[in-house]
Amino acid sequence: MSLRIYNTATRQKEDFVPVDPAAIKMYVCGPTVYNLVHIGNARPVVVFDTLFRVLQYLYDNVIYARNITDIDDKIMKAAAENGEPISALAARYAAEYERDMAQLNALQPTIVPYATEHLEQMIAMTQALVNKGHAYAADGHVLFDVQSMGDYGELSNRSLEDMLDGARVEVAPYKKYAGDFVLWKPSADAEPGWESPWGRGRPGWHLECSAMIEKHLGNTIDIHGGGRDLIFPHHENERAQSQCAHDGEQYVKYWMHNGYINIDGEKMSKSLGNFRTVRELLESFPGEVIRFALLSAQYRSELDFSAELLEQSKASLDSLYGALRKTEEEILPAGPALAASPGFAALMDDLNTPLAISELHQLARTVHKAEPESEEAQSAKGMMLALANLMGLLQEDPETWFQGGAEQDVSWIEALIAERQQAKLDKQYARADEIREELKAKGILLEDSREGTTWKKA
């Protein structure tokens, strides 16, 4: 069974054939750190974290880089408004980003490069492009000459004319062509800047990723991921810079892009004021619920994110954890059987997480129907955990999941449950009902089964 992924560059699904099976290389565009990240920033993290997990299952050595853009006009503006150094603001929000992503069960990438630590590589790549006739200096700027590249626009499937018609292009007098983009720009005295052959300045956004990939992953990588909004101009320009700097050598073999997020049926945008930060959502829902919601649609499709979706995701996870909680017997690890399972096949088909999640529910039904101590139940639980782990789900102990976040004293709750159990044995059913209602009023729900009574937070 081969991993198949949709390649934006060819606009079709392809078998994944790595450049070097001994070292799989994947890069995903990370955040520009000037504020708390919104749910749209989280989707590529969760999507490509899932791919990272699948690749780690398939290959011994997977190198995953996700950058931090810590120099940008937005960061400069936010720092000025806050009256704090740019580096301090960027460091603070980078830490907040990592904190939020950890709450979503995202693994730490192999490499987390910061843009400001790669100025030497950025200047060197810019100089190489000038030397090769693909870039030119003008009025303190260095610009990439898009007309110097014969297949510029191939990734986004646009002509130069289409790009100018459909994009916000800065028309500056120092440009040879309106579509030329900035590699290096001058910095005013009050702005951050670095010395270069073209004067004191700072890099353009597109250059940063190209330089970081070159340093840490080499000239050609297997997978480059990000949101669909990055296809043009960011990824198109990355590809142009890197391939022209390396004499046409292929930059990326497989380009992958996740779809947009809509909020309550409307596209998330600043103008609509419907941004939802991950931190805001974490105040109401566990991170695993948010992750489940993000995986509930196939990654290339648009996702309608809403409170209803989060409630549905919480209910689904409750059901899955309920199956894991059903028996205390030791599980049987899935082992090699995972690779032959329908759920694994779904993930191998361009990360079809909705289908894989439906397989988790099927396994949960098997657990519920089987005798708790049976091999069938334990095998199904083992398969559930193995498949869920590839999606970063079911990472909690079931008891912790159901009891987590309850502020009530656990010993008090369990003492009342024991009293209720004794009341039932003594046929004092009115008292047993009183205890149930008392706990319910405190947000604690009881579940009776033949194995005993368990509780969870409402």
Curated annotation (Swiss-Prot):
Organism: Teredinibacter turnerae (strain ATCC 39867 / T7901)
Pfam families: CysS_C, DALR_2, tRNA-synt_1e
Protein name, per record: Cysteine--tRNA ligase
Subcellular localization(s) per the UniProt record: Cytoplasm
Alphabetical list of Gene3D superfamilies matching this protein: Cysteine-tRNA ligase, C-terminal anti-codon recognition domain (1.20.120.1910), HUPs (3.40.50.620)
Subunit-level organization: Monomer.
Binding residue positions for Zn(2+): 29, 209, 234, 238
Record motif 'KMSKS' region, residues: 267-271
PANTHER family: CYSTEINE--TRNA LIGASE, CYTOPLASMIC, CYSTEINYL-TRNA SYNTHETASE
GO cellular component, one term: cytosol
HAMAP family: Cys_tRNA_synth
The EC number(s) this enzyme carries: 6.1.1.16
Segments carrying motif 'HIGH' region: 31-41
Protein family (similarity comment): Belongs to the class-I aminoacyl-tRNA synthetase family.
Top-level EC class: ligase
Primary subcellular site in the record, as a coarse category: cytoplasm
Entry binding sites for ATP: 270
InterPro entries according to UniProt: Cys-tRNA-ligase, Cys-tRNA-synt_Ia_DALR, Cys-tRNA/MSH_ligase, CysS_C, Rossmann-like_a/b/a_fold, tRNA-synt_1_cat_dom, tRNAsynth_Ia_anticodon-bd
Alphabetized GO MF terms: ATP binding; cysteine-tRNA ligase activity; zinc ion binding
Gene Ontology BP annotations: cysteinyl-tRNA aminoacylation
Keyword annotations from UniProtKB, A to Z: Aminoacyl-tRNA synthetase, ATP-binding, Cytoplasm, Ligase, Metal-binding, Nucleotide-binding, Protein biosynthesis, Zinc
Catalytic reactions of this protein: tRNA(Cys) + L-cysteine + ATP = L-cysteinyl-tRNA(Cys) + AMP + diphosphate
SUPFAM superfamilies: Anticodon-binding domain of a subclass of class I aminoacyl-tRNA synthetases, Nucleotidylyl transferase
Cofactors: Zn(2+)
Cofactor note: Binds 1 zinc ion per subunit.
